[in-house]
């Protein structure tokens, strides 16, 4: 946890205390927290930076609940601009109003104001997380959201302890300024280091002052449930502990078939549960979180790494005179371990939850790439790369224009959407092409012919109880990134992933209908595709976006409208009393 400045410390000590109350009612409880969001100063690498935190903590407080509980979080905004809190992965069944997606389900909480989020957590067990959902604030405003089984039983031996491992990034640049620069088309800024639970690690130093490392204390022979969460804005991470192996047992609040590995790959937005047994000779062992990135000709950024420590009870600070073992990490440009890790995971079959829809009502084929538009306009610029153009991210050649003064859900519910959005999000790209041709990465005539792009707020509407299949296809238009796609309000069946261009005749045979993963964030591999299915059983307005922050800001997003079902129990209820409509609420955005 970072140290507070004196003023902020007094503020938090006198006026702000974390309130976490569990009021037992029958089998379920009400778990209540107060989140005070404020600025504070933190010093790393010889520089003091203003950061934005909850209750003086980076990462923020852990929300720890049992399946079936009601969660109540009072958010007090002491920032000079608005923000929302999103409960990443919580299904929010019939509680879309509490999803916390800025300008999608609600307008940001204005400066000096308060807002209460209230929702139930049902049908989910495992690791989720929460984070700010406006601008780049989630880099430091985030925390774990743990859902424990109601009966206290796991489908694996109960661990001695569970520990959140929150992987993030340390930015010296003010996050609000970072957001402004990216909104203006400047993507040259980078974090200075990776972090593990807010610690930069001893590989980072300045003037021979070594940064603090996260330390995991263990006892020989005991097992530990590591809840590995990637909160980073920019990068997917490889995570390894020297001398130890993992058993992957869950992801995104759902159990997985146990999978043994010596390295975890976690994309932005993902939460991976792994069991680590402390079965190595008692000593100290390094853990490493290493960012990966595509090789050239993709744009290159520095290597981000954080190093922590696993420390066995009874061992000495000098590690008994032996060097501390280091894990051997992949080359940062080798993205294949990510593909193999994700493709090898399967869901733990459950007769009630794993009912893959075999009939498909609507199919979408969604390409993910980049394009460019003229500044001040919403269409592709023919002036090539110049100050008059701005690079955007697209889905089927449409870059999402995020609302700035109103919330899409409110307009939909009130029937006042005219002029705010349209419901013609394209279900396929304008024309097929060789989506993974690496000759498209450098800007040029070949890429330019396929690039035509426009910016608009285009949504897709579904009737209640529609069976939907989406093929996400990563492209090499100006870059070849992977794309961690996150759908709010839903768990989706991840039927298959593959490399190259999706081919229906060939690749449908690879679909796993027996025990697919249930995920809220799907890693679409670099130069590849992912196939998902889900049933629209949760009415409301649900944001779909890439979880790379620069892709969100550039427009790789849309929203799905799910209509009400035939009964009150299948319909979105009116907004709760605590919901504040946008209106003239003194909203101040950076």
Curated annotation (Swiss-Prot):
Glycosylated residues, chain numbering: 41, 47, 120, 205, 344, 378, 397, 434, 465
> What is the species listed in this Swiss-Prot or TrEMBL entry?
Oryza sativa subsp. japonica (Rice)
Domain Plastocyanin-like span(s) in chain numbering: 36-152, 161-315, 424-566
Q: How is the cofactor bound?
A: Binds 4 Cu cations per monomer.
Catalytic activities: 4 hydroquinone + O2 = 4 benzosemiquinone + 2 H2O
Binding-site residues, Cu cation 1: 86, 486
What subcellular compartments does it reside in?
Secreted, Extracellular space, Apoplast
Binding of Cu cation 2, residues: 88, 131, 547
Name this polypeptide is given = Laccase-19
Its GO CC terms? apoplast
What is the protein's major site of localization? secreted
What family classification does the UniProt entry report for this protein? Belongs to the multicopper oxidase family.
Q: Say yes or no: keyword Transport present.
A: no
Write out the residues that bind Cu cation 4.
483, 546, 551, 556
Which SUPFAM superfamilies does the record associate with it? Cupredoxins
UniProt keyword list: Apoplast, Copper, Glycoprotein, Lignin degradation, Metal-binding, Oxidoreductase, Repeat, Secreted, Signal
For this protein, the Enzyme Commission number is 1.10.3.2
What Pfam family is a match for this entry? Cu-oxidase_3
Q: Which GO terms describe its biological process?
A: lignin catabolic process
């Amino acid at each position: 946890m970072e140290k507070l400045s004196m003023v902020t410390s007094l503020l938090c000590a006198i006026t702000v205390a974390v309130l976490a109350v569990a009021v037992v009612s029958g089998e379920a409880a009400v778990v209540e927290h107060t989140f005070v969001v404020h600025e504070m100063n933190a010093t790393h690498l010889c520089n003091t930076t203003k950061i934005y935190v909850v209750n003086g903590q980076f990462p923020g407080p852990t929300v720890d609940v049992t399946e079936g509980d009601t969660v109540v979080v009072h958010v007090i905004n002491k920032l000079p601009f608005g923000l929302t809190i999103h409960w990443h992965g919580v299904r929010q069944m019939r509680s879309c109003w509490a999803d916390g997606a800025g300008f999608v389900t609600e307008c940001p909480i204005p400066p000096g104001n308060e807002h209460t989020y209230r929702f139930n957590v049902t049908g989910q067990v495992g690791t989720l997380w929460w984070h700010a959902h406006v601008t780049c604030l989630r880099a430091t405003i985030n925390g774990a959201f743990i859902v424990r089984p109601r009966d206290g039983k796991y489908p694996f031996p109960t661990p001695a302890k569970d520990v959140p491992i929150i992987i993030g990034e340390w930015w010296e640049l003010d996050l609000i300024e970072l957001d402004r620069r990216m909104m203006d088309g400047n993507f040259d800024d980078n974090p200075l280091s990776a972090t593990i639970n807010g610690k930069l690690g001893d590989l980072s130093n300045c003037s021979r002052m070594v940064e603090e490392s996260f330390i995991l204390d263990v006892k020989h022979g005991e097992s530990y449930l590591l809840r590995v969460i990637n909160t980073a804005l920019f990068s997917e991470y490889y995570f390894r502990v020297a001398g130890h192996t993992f058993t992957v047992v869950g992801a995104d609040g759902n159990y997985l078939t146990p999978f043994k590995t010596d390295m975890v790959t976690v994309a932005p937005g993902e939460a991976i549960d792994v069991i680590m047994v402390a079965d190595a000779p008692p000593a100290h062992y390094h853990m490493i979180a290493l960012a990966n990135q595509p090789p050239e000709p993709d744009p290159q950024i520095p290597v981000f790494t954080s190093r922590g420590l696993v420390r066995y009870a009874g061992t000495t600070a000098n590690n008994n005179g032996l060097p501390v073992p280091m894990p051997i990490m992949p080359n940062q440009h080798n993205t294949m371990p990510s593909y193999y890790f994700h493709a090898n995971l399967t869901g733990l079959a459950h007769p009630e939850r794993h009912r893959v829809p075999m009939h498909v009502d609507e199919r979408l084929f969604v390409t993910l790439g980049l394009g460019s538009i003229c500044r001040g306009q919403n269409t592709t610029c023919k002036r090539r790369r110049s100050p008059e153009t701005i690079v955007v991210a697209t889905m089927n050649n449409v870059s999402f224009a995020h609302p700035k003064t109103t919330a899409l859900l409110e307009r939909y519910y009130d029937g006042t959407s005219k002029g705010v959005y349209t419901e013609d999000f394209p279900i396929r790209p304008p024309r097929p092409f060789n989506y993974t041709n690496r000759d498209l990465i450098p800007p040029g005539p070949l890429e330019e012919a396929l690039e035509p792009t426009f910016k608009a707020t285009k949504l897709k509407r579904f009737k209640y109880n529609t069976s939907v299949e989406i093929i996400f296809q990563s492209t090499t238009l100006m870059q070849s990134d992977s794309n961690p796609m996150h759908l709010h309000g839903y768990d989706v069946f991840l039927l298959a992933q593959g490399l190259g261009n999706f081919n229906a005749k060939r690749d449908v045979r690879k679909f796993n209908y027996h025990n697919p993963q249930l995920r809220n964030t799907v890693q679409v591999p670099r130069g590849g595709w992912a196939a998902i299915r889900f049933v629209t059983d949760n009415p409301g307005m649900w944001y779909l976006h890439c979880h790379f922050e620069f892709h969100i800001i550039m427009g790789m997003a849309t929203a799905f409208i799910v209509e009400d079902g035939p009964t009150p129990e299948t319909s979105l209820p009116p907004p709760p009393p605590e919901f504040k409509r946008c209106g003239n609420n003194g909203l101040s955005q950076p």
